[in-house]
A protein has these predicted regions:
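Amphipathic alpha-helical interaction segments
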Residues: 104, 174, 178, 196, ...
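Mid-to-C-terminal catalytic/tRNA-binding core of tRNA(Ile)-lysidine synthase
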Residues: 223-321
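Conserved Class I S-adenosyl-L-methionine
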Residues: 213-224
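Residue-level recognition of alpha-helical structural elements
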Residues: 71, 190-193, 260
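An accessory alpha-helical subdomain
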Residues: 183-208, 214, 231-246, 250-251
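Core alpha/beta nucleotide-donor-binding catalytic domains of modification enzymes
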Residues: 1-181
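Generic structural signal for individual residues within well-ordered alpha-helical segments
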Residues: 76, 84, 149, 195, ...
Length: 322
């Protein structure tokens, strides 16, 4: 198991719990820490964390971002890329992060505020593939942030908190500090229920994806060629929600995974039966062309390095470092 460790209470609680369970499951635990270089003391903190891990007999790999950007979405992409590479090199079958039920509730509220579709609102899953051989696991989704704090204190684990988690410039931090406390005051237990809703949406999404694949197969211009185009008239005869879901899924399969919900709505308007042929640029440089009979992609769009799931539609601008 490759554990992503920031030094905060969630990831330290994760290390403590999995270390205690190691004797039962005989896991090989490897720690990974990413230094974004955002703070003058980040290298010192990384060194202190490395010293603690060595004292505990836990191997830790340090990675420093060579071209840091003060954008959480870019940082998150860098972390996932490095974690995938490290997992493959070390032979780890799972990357494990310390996301909690509190993170899930915050993500749901963020996606609701953005007008995200259901896929985004159920984005933090227990388990999902990163590539053909490595899965991403989030075993702490059953715990709230206050509970991971109790675990950290009970196990007497050290902390290296990240001040950026309190920076009000990030949307997630303001939801954590300002929005959720109001919801908890109005409806005690709101965070836990929001997390449960996100979990149910994720479960429903997995079943829905199977149905979407069957429906898309019927809409292909060439049944044996998923890149041969989509039947425009058949697509636009469907109910609006089904049109939206199937077009989004098809575009993802063509490589355009970063199309926003607003862009999707504008595209559907252009595909109405009374509108003529046209074309539209896709994220990443590809182009979508349509005649009165079919839709066709040329050049592809973005080729995402991970399956759609956590942040591709749209990306979460501030998912804390795991």
């Amino acid at each position: 198991l490759l554990l992503a460790v920031s030094g905060g209470q969630d990831s330290m609680a994760l290390v403590g719990l999995l270390r205690d369970l190691q004797r039962l499951h005989h896991w090989r635990l490897l720690l990974w820490h990413g230094d974004h270089g955002w703070r003058p003391d980040s290298a010192q903190q990384a060194s202190a964390l490395e010293g603690w891990a060595q004292a505990q007999g836990l191997p830790l790999q340090l990675e420093r971002w060579q071209r840091p950007q003060r954008q959480e979405a870019a940082a998150r992409h860098w972390r996932l890329e490095q974690l995938q590479r490290s997992a493959v090199q070390s032979g780890a079958s799972r990357v494990v992060t310390g996301h909690t039920a509190s993170d899930r509730a915050e993500t749901l509220l963020l996606q609701l505020a953005r007008g995200s579709h259901r896929q985004g609102m159920g984005s933090l899953r227990w388990l999902r593939p990163l590539n053909a051989t490595v899965q991403l696991a989030r075993p702490l989704l059953v715990f709230s942030r206050s509970e991971t704090g109790q675990i950290q204190r009970h196990l007497q684990l050290p902390l290296w908190p990240d001040p950026s988690n309190d920076d009000p410039r990030f949307s997630r931090n303001r939801i954590r500090a300002e929005v959720l406390p109001v919801l908890e005051a109005l409806h005690p237990g709101a965070s836990r229920r929001l997390s449960g809703l996100s979990s149910r949406l994720a479960d429903e999404q997995e079943g829905q994806q199977q149905l979407e694949q069957l429906a898309l197969q019927a809409l292909l211009v060439e049944q044996a060629n998923p890149h041969g185009g989509l039947q425009r008239q058949a697509l636009m005869q469907l109910e609006a929600g089904n049109r939206r879901r199937l077009l989004r899924t098809w575009l993802e399969q063509q490589g355009a995974a970063s199309v926003s919900a607003a862009e999707l709505e504008r595209l559907l308007e252009q595909l109405e039966p009374q509108r003529g042929p046209g074309e539209r640029r896709l994220p990443g440089g590809g182009r979508l062309h349509w005649t009165r009979e079919r839709l066709h992609c040329e050049g592809g769009g973005d080729k995402p390095g991970e399956p759609p799931g956590d942040a591709n539609w749209p990306a979460d601008p501030h998912e804390h470092q795991p």
